[in-house]
Amino acid sequence: MEAWIEFGRGPLFRLTFSLMVLGLLRVFILTIVGIAEAYRRSSDRIVPWKQVARQTAGWLFPIGRLWRKRAVYSSTSFLFHAGLLLVPFFLAAHVLLWSRSLGFAWPAMPRRLADWLTLLTIGAALGLFFGRVLHRCARALSRPQDYFWPWLLAIPFVTGYACANLAVRPEAYQTSMLLHVYSADLIMAMVPFTKIAHCVLAPLSQTVTAVSWKFVPGAGDRVAATLGYTDRPIWIEKARSDAAPAAFADARKGTCPK
């Protein structure tokens, strides 16, 4: 089993990491190309870039937005993403692994902080899962992978914490380490081909929305006409929900379609 573990955190790790990086780079480049193509083909090239930049910053650093809607769920999601980013890159054992593969290293976080972040990430994964299961609106918008991913992403954290902190027999330790290594490799291999690719697309999300709205000539105008906004610009500072008696009635009430 030790040979399988070494293979998983050696050649297989380098392969899946390379696949993840190249795959995410491809997704990022194709998105940029799509934005440029939409902008080139549009007859309306007026885009409020400053507003888009502010909205992008607000989505990347959502501290002030966490309490607006579903505060507990939003805060849980924020903690989950923080743990996913920090622990894999700054846990001391992981820094050593990165050093072996990349040839250089960086400072590691304290062990106690890593343990607490690991536990918070595990708890947040459970919270996100049940937050979808128990919330009717979230269930209506969720796909099967939305329920699958929190569990898969939690496996490396559960097994890693067990290996680092629990006194177990050598056989149990090796089994946990095998699950830890191969679940992480599986995640890296899947990232570019699933919704987790949003980790590199998040900085572009508001730009995509602003530009792609005009991708099909006249599409934005037709949507605005359907909503009764033919006399208003497509992008405005204030949300239109206050003036939309029918289209946004459910949104104002905090309900969702059945």
Predicted regions and their residues:
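Membrane-embedded alpha-helical bundles that constitute the cytochrome b-like, heme-associated redox core
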Residues: 1-258
